[in-house]
């Protein structure tokens, strides 16, 4: 499983969602996802999808957001 994933690549919601779900399936409690330039795509939609894996937003800044798997 991955403990930390930094997303800094495609800026299309569909592409980011595909990557996030792929890594979420390979994560565990405590895994953190950091998304760069999250205002360029629909982060609300992605974060909502990740809640089914137990991810919650723990910090957000100007262009980065961090989610952590709580369960």
What positions do the PLM features span?
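C-terminal substrate-binding/active-site "lid" region of AdoMet-derived donor-dependent transferases
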Residues: 13-71
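A short acidic, Gly/Pro-enriched loop at the edge of an enzyme's catalytic core
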Residues: 1-5
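Switch II (G3) loop of P-loop NTPases
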Residues: 8-11
């Amino acid at each position: 499983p991955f403990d930390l994933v930094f997303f800094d690549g495609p800026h299309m919601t569909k592409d980011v969602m595909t990557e996030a779900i792929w890594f979420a399936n390979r994560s565990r409690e405590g895994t953190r996802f950091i998304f760069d330039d999250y205002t360029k795509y629909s982060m609300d939609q992605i974060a909502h999808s990740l809640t089914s894996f137990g991810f919650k937003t723990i910090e957000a800044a100007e262009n980065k957001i961090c989610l952590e798997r709580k369960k």
